[in-house]
Structures are given as C-alpha cells and as structure tokens.
Amino acid sequence: GFESITGTKDACKLDQELTSTGGVIEAVAGNPNAIGYASLSAVEGKDTVKAVTVGGVACTEATVLDGSYAIQRPFVLVTKTGETLSPAAQAFFDYATSSTASQLIKAAGAVPVAK
C-alpha cells in the first residue's frame, strides 16, 4: 500500500477515514498537511489539490497505463469463480472493455479498463 511504497509506515497517522472521493478531495483541500487517495480523474483540473509526483514520475494517464507511476490501483471487473456469465453480464463485460467504452471513459477523464 501507500505506506510501504513511500517508506512511511511508522510515520503515518490515520486521522480520518472518508468514504467518498468528494469527501477526500474536500478534506485534503482544507488541510495543508493532509494526504488522501482519489482517482486521477477526480484530481485532474482541480486547483485545490494535486496528484503527488513519486520517484520523479508525475501522475498522468500515460504513467498510470505504463505502470511507472508507483502509487496506483487497478479498477477490476470481477465475477464468481466457476460461474458462466449470463448473456447480459457477458454483454456488459464485452462493452466495458470495448473501444467505444474506452473512448467514453477517456472522455470522462478516467483511464479505461483492459481485457
């Protein structure tokens, strides 16, 4: 996690646990000593918070996709092991990983999923 990547395990103090991206952005914007987790799309274009550069690598779509930005987590689609997807679920998975969906996801400011 964050603490192991940054080497700050013993220095971090959990002060507040938030359950929404908007709450994290608001809390970090209001506290100059705060650090929070948020999706890149939630941070881009904001003048109140910024993504942290890690090891000289800025957080961009390109560095997320190529894996060079160290503090990231994938968004994954999951199903129950051993179960065959229903036609509707398979259609959703096919669409979510299609080039059409990728374009929509990019337009929304997020990094598209891969198959």
For each feature predicted by the language model, list its residue ranges.
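Exported/periplasmic ABC-transporter solute-binding proteins
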Residues: 1-115
